[in-house]
């Protein structure tokens, strides 16, 4: 686990999603730990039509790997304003660069205070060690 990357400028959920907040918008993806546990990602289902809403701790999609299928839970609430269309044809971007090219959604925050419910990188690392 020591070789896994968890950037300090992001926030993390207990369900292994990350959030990058920029003003009133947030980018969402899954952590390096999550993609490592899943193995090779072969398919992802996201709300491809922007303008849908997501709610904190509720399902926003599914991710399928050679090992398993898992639900994606939103770490924050808001309106989807952008979806990473590249993941339709190349879901392996999530394995290759989970914090860069492997991002999933950009959301306009509806409740910025929810960010306070998420963990810092150090808190997330400690959480993973306690699993």
List where the protein language model places each region:
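Short connector loops at helix/strand junctions that flank enzyme active sites
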Residues: 67, 73-75, 100-102
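Acidic, low-complexity mobile loops and tails
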Residues: 1-59, 92, 96-131
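Charged, amphipathic alpha-helical coiled-coil/dimerization segments
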Residues: 77, 81-82, 89, 95
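Short glycine/proline-centered loop/turn elements that form peptide/ligand docking sites
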Residues: 49, 67-68
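Short coil-to-beta-strand transition motifs
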Residues: 9-13, 71-77
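Residue-level recognition of beta-strand microenvironments
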Residues: 19-21, 66, 83-86, 112
């Amino acid at each position: 686990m020591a070789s896994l990357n968890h950037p300090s400028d992001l926030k993390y959920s207990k369900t292994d999603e990350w959030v990058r907040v920029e003003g009133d918008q947030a980018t969402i993806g899954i952590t390096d730990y999550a993609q490592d546990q899943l193995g090779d990602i072969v398919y992802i289902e996201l709300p491809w039509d922007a303008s849908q809403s997501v709610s904190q701790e509720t399902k926003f999609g599914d991710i399928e790997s050679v090992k398993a299928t898992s639900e994606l839970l939103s770490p924050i609430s808001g309106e989807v304003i952008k979806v990473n269309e590249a993941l339709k044809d190349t879901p392996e971007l999530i394995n290759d660069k989970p914090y860069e090219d492997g991002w999933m959604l950009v959301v306009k925050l509806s409740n910025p205070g929810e960010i306070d419910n998420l963990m810092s990188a150090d808190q997330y690392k400690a959480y993973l060690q306690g699993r």
